Regions:
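Acidic-basic catalytic patches of nuclease active cores, encompassing PD-(D/E)XK
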Residues: 1-50
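Intrinsic disorder/low-complexity signal
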Residues: 4, 59, 138-139
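A short catalytic or substrate-binding loop motif that flags glycine-/basic-rich loops and adjacent residues
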Residues: 53-56
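Compact nucleic-acid interaction/catalytic patches
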Residues: 80-86
Length: 202
């Protein structure tokens, strides 16, 4: 699949995901700056200061539910991998007390989990599926395509080649459980003093 085909498939996956969430009763809005301010974020593609990185890797959407709504971030990934920079920025978002759900899709499979429950496979392990001469370099468990001569010879002109890890599929939940898992999490996270004021449709 070419870069353009992957991009098109990823956009279709995200659109369907957000439509599915709306159908479940969630109110959903776009959040990622590549959707809301594409010209602005394109100027930041090489910026690595913290604010620019947070902007570049903002989750794709935000969603809420309830009479007095509670909210969460949602990221749509049409892949089984996570970029290192994205993972770090997601972690900072969660460390600040935010809820982030990442939904993965590929080959008609849709699965998800909360950021903190997702496990990543060290590159030293996932790389064992390939012959030694076909493996990319690994540093601190992250795979670095750009640091290999293989990348120079085979890369797509639009592919990023940034460090990544594969996601452990055993740490993900079937999408059919999404509504239940999210609503239960939002109930747990609410302040006890506000329990009588928050009502969910579940």
């Amino acid at each position: 699949m070419s870069f353009e085909e992957r991009s098109k498939a990823a956009k279709e996956f995200q659109d369907k995901l957000f439509a599915d969430l709306q159908a479940m009763g969630f109110n959903v809005a776009l959040n990622g700056t590549e959707h809301t301010h594409p010209a602005f974020v394109s100027e930041l593609h090489r910026s690595e200061d913290q604010t620019s990185m947070a902007i570049r890797y903002a989750p794709d959407g935000v969603a809420c539910i309830g009479k007095i709504p509670r909210s969460f971030y949602v990221e749509a990934k049409f892949a089984r991998t996570i970029e290192r920079n994205a993972w770090i920025q997601y972690g900072k978002l969660v460390e600040a007390g935010n809820i982030l759900v990442i939904v993965f899709g590929w080959e008609n499979n849709t699965v998800f989990n909360f950021y903190e429950n997702i496990k990543l496979i060290p590159g030293e392990i996932s790389g064992l599926r390939y012959p030694a001469e076909s493996r990319y370099p690994v540093e601190d468990g992250w795979i670095y395509p750009r640091k290999s001569k293989l990348w120079d010879n085979s890369k797509s002109p639009k592919a990023s080649g940034t460090p990544y890890k594969e996601v452990d599929l055993n740490s993900l939940i079937p999408f059919s459980e999404f509504y239940k898992e999210i609503v239960n999490r939002l109930r747990v996270e609410q302040c006890p003093s506000m329990t009588s004021n928050i009502s969910f449709s579940a």
